Curated annotation (Swiss-Prot):
GO biological process: regulation of viral transcription; transcription antitermination; viral transcription
C3H1-type zinc finger locations on the chain: 1-27
Record comment regarding domains: Contains a zinc-finger domain on its N-terminus essential for its anti-termination function. Contains an oligomerization domain. The central globular core is responsible for binding to RNA and phosphoprotein.
Assembly: Homotetramer. The homotetramer interacts with RNA. Interacts with the phosphoprotein (P); this interaction is required for protein M2-1 function, localization in host inclusion bodies. Formation of a complex host PP1/M2-1/P allows P to target host PP1 phosphatase to the M2-1 substrate. Interacts with the nucleoprotein (N). Interacts with the matrix protein (M); this interaction directs M localization to cytoplasmic inclusions comprising viral proteins L, N, P, and M2-1 and mediates M association with the nucleocapsid. Interacts with host PABPC1 (via C-terminus).
Chain positions covered by the region annotation Oligomerization: 31-48
Region Globular core: start-end pairs: 75-169
Location relative to the cell: Virion; Host cytoplasm; Host nucleus
Residue numbers carrying Phosphoserine: 57, 60
Species annotation: Murine pneumonia virus (strain 15)
Record's function text: Acts as a tetrameric transcription processivity factor that binds in a competitive manner to RNA and the phosphoprotein (P) to prevent premature termination during transcription. Transcription anti-terminator that enhances readthrough of intergenic junctions during viral transcription. Preferentially binds to poly(A)-rich sequences. Plays a role in the association of the matrix protein with the nucleocapsid, which initiates assembly and budding.
Protein name according to UniProt: Protein M2-1
GO molecular function: RNA binding; structural molecule activity; zinc ion binding
UniProt entry keywords in alphabetical sequence: Host cytoplasm, Host nucleus, Metal-binding, Phosphoprotein, RNA-binding, Transcription, Transcription antitermination, Transcription regulation, Viral transcription, Virion, Zinc, Zinc-finger
GO cellular component: host cell cytoplasm; host cell nucleus; virion component
Length: 176
């Protein structure tokens, strides 16, 4: 075992375990190295406490300024703007607002809307696709990644079907 401090341990955490040949004993380290480790640790804490970044923006690119567009236009407004190519709505913003719409949809109402119109096969297919996305919604990072990888045409068709199904559900709720 060397007396030299492990550079990975100085920067945070050494994942080599017993295979590491360098010193992990802090009391043997020189003061300069201890100060350097303290600086790394404080920077890491500061990075995690920074309010400008959050987990959702790290994964999907769907950060705070984009969520304000959703707040101003509404989730359906963002989706319609993406379809019409207005208001400078990007694919990641549309995927994020699509997820919020899917979270707000009730599975039972979507199944009821699907069963009410059994003649149209395209409508049945889109309802089943929406139900499968609703089932996967508990894995938010994964579903954002899946939606962002969809081709633009497929994503636009999915958005149109979600909007039409949501409007049908809302109109049936208002009549009852």
């Amino acid at each position: 075992m060397s007396v030299r401090p492990c550079k990975f341990e100085v920067q945070g955490f050494c994942s080599r375990g017993r295979n590491c040949k360098y010193s992990h004993k802090y009391w043997e380290w020189p003061l300069k190295t201890l100060m350097l480790r303290q600086n790394y640790m404080l920077n890491r804490i500061y990075r995690f406490l920074d309010t400008n970044t959050d987990a959702m923006s790290d994964v999907s690119g769907f950060d705070a300024p984009q969520r304000t567009a959703e707040y101003a236009l509404g989730t359906i407004g963002v989706l319609k703007s993406y379809l019409e190519k207005t208001n400078n709505i990007t694919k990641s913003i549309a995927c994020g607002s699509l997820i919020t719409v899917l979270q707000n949809l009730d599975v039972g109402l979507v199944i009821q809307a699907r069963d009410s119109n059994t003649e149209d096969t395209n409508y049945l297919r889109s309802c089943n696709t929406i139900l499968s996305y609703i089932d996967k919604i508990h894995k938010k990072r994964q579903i954002i990644h899946i939606l962002k990888r969809l081709p633009v045409g497929v994503l636009c068709n999915l958005i149109q079907s979600v909007i039409s199904i949501e409007e049908k559900i809302n109109s049936s709720m208002k009549t009852e």
